[in-house]
From Swiss-Prot:
GO biological process, one term: isopentenyl diphosphate biosynthetic process, methylerythritol 4-phosphate pathway
Site entry (Positions MEP for the nucleophilic attack), positions: 148, 205
Name recorded for this polypeptide: Bifunctional enzyme IspD/IspF
Family (UniProt): In the N-terminal section; belongs to the IspD/TarI cytidylyltransferase family. IspD subfamily. In the C-terminal section; belongs to the IspF family.
Pathway: Isoprenoid biosynthesis; isopentenyl diphosphate biosynthesis via DXP pathway; isopentenyl diphosphate from 1-deoxy-D-xylulose 5-phosphate: step 2/6; Isoprenoid biosynthesis; isopentenyl diphosphate biosynthesis via DXP pathway; isopentenyl diphosphate from 1-deoxy-D-xylulose 5-phosphate: step 4/6
Keywords: Isoprene biosynthesis, Lyase, Metal-binding, Multifunctional enzyme, Nucleotidyltransferase, Transferase
Segments of this protein annotated with the region 2-C-methyl-D-erythritol 4-phosphate cytidylyltransferase: 1-229
Binding positions for a divalent metal cation per the UniProt entry: 236, 238, 270
SUPFAM superfamilies according to UniProt: IpsF-like, Nucleotide-diphospho-sugar transferases
Cofactor: a divalent metal cation
Gene3D superfamilies named in the record: 2-C-methyl-D-erythritol 2,4-cyclodiphosphate synthase, Spore Coat Polysaccharide Biosynthesis Protein SpsA, Chain A
Pfam families in UniProt: IspD, YgbB
Length: 390
């Protein structure tokens, strides 16, 4: 279940708490992995908010054949019902319902929950309440002490025979009963037997901002984190032919000749496109835009680089830096550097301090020295979710 807004955790540029990073990985990605790694689990329905599809793709770029996305409703109870309905065609024997913000669910607990499931009862992992409980009066003064004997704090995943728990949710929906605080309460209402088993102290729910901070600190202490930072390089060269301007980084620069190419021959953008694609192992510019395809004849090269940037972002990548070195005797790049930098900022959606454009000559050596063309070398640095695997 990952359709909530997580308002108690406060606002974050990363989105609701299920998409915040702990140990360089989104909370939801870590939670989901516990289930995709479990051989006892079949289809997994991930229920998300209707506005969160882009956040989900960034948090969980990997494709899992047994994972389906379900759009949730206005409440957790309604989102759960919709998630259960999404599995109706498969009609599994059992179902586990888990909070997406409990990322420390372990394989041992999952296996014990499943082992205790029967057609006649559900399973609720829970921990005995260790603290003394007090009931307060309206004025905040202690009214009475409550015996903690037989009291447990419920956790998830809560597991049930599929058909009975779906039926219970449908009945609650039919009469607009929305006051259940968890799925075990709905099961209790419909007299579905639920067995309590020992939960796990590690299986905490991340509710407040401090919970997320502590989870991040815990993961970083558990092991050295190697962020998934990737670097790609690109190189391109185009010869001159008769003309009156060259296009570099999307900017037209007056010149005594133009660059020869199938598209607009923007040597800088071509090199940078290859550099971005390299960070995904996604081939080169010719793979995506073959020169044999007439539709790219004379095309603006910003189409190519924006396509490469889209591939990066769909995998959750954030472009940290791009660097372009132009090698030419002419034209002079300096007077146009600011415009070229701004053009790259607009194409890639990054700040100017993350863009470097440099120029050098070839000291009159080789084809560049003979003013026969321009070469470009580009480097892109991209940060992807997660970390480098061991």
């Amino acid at each position: 279940m990952a359709a909530g807004r997580g308002e108690r955790a406060g606002q974050s540029a990363e989105g609701p708490k299920q998409y915040r990073l702990i140990g360089a990985e989104a909370v939801l990605a870590r939670t989901l992995r516990a289930f995709t790694d479990c051989p006892l689990i079949g289809t997994i329905a991930v229920v998300i908010h209707p506005d969160d599809h882009a956040l989900y793709r960034r948090a969980v770029p990997e494709k899992h054949e047994n994972v389906i996305l379900v759009t949730g409703g206005p409440t957790r109870q309604e989102s759960t019902r919709l998630g259960l309905l999404a599995l109706k065609d498969e009609a599994p024997q059992y179902v586990l319902i888990h909070d997406g913000v409990r990322p420390f669910i372990g394989q041992d607990l999952l296996e014990r929950i499943i082992a205790n499931l029967t057609p006649d009862n559900g399973v609720l992992p829970a921990l005995a309440v260790p603290d003394t409980l007090k009931r307060a009066a309206a004025d905040g003064m202690v009214e009475t002490t409550i015996s903690r004997t037989g009291l447990f704090a419920a956790q998830t995943p809560q597991a049930f025979p599929y058909a009975p728990i779906l039926d219970a949710h449908e009945k609650a929906f039919a009469i607009n009963r929305t006051d259940f605080t968890d799925d075990a309460a709905i099961a209790e209402w419909q007299e579905i037997a639920v067995r309590i088993i020992e939960g796990s102290a590690d299986n905490t729910k991340l509710t407040w901002a401090k919970d997320i901070e502590m989870a991040d600190k815990r993961l970083r202490q558990d092991h050295a984190v190697f962020p998934d930072i990737r670097t790609g390089n690109g190189y391109d060269v185009h010869s001159f032919e008769p003309g009156d301007h060259v296009t570099l980084c999307g900017v037209k620069i007056p010149h005594e000749a133009k660059l020869n190419g199938h598209s607009d021959a923007d040597v800088a953008l071509h090199a940078l496109t290859d550099a971005l694609l390299a960070t995904r192992g996604a081939g080169d510019i010719g793979t995506h835009f073959p020169p044999s395809d007439s539709q790219w004849k004379g095309a603006a090269s910003r189409i190519f680089i924006e396509h490469a940037a889209k591939i990066v972002r769909e995998a959750g990548g954030r472009i940290a830096n791009v660097d372009v070195t132009l090698i030419s005797e002419a034209p002079k790049i300096g007077p146009h550097r600011a415009a070229m930098t701004q053009a790259l900022c607009d194409m890639l959606g990054i700040a100017a301090d993350r863009v470097s454009i440099k120029a050098t000559t070839n000291e009159k050596l080789g084809f560049v020295g003979r003013r026969e063309g321009i070469a470009a070398i580009a480097t892109a640095t991209v940060i992807y979710p997660g970390e480098v695997p061991e």
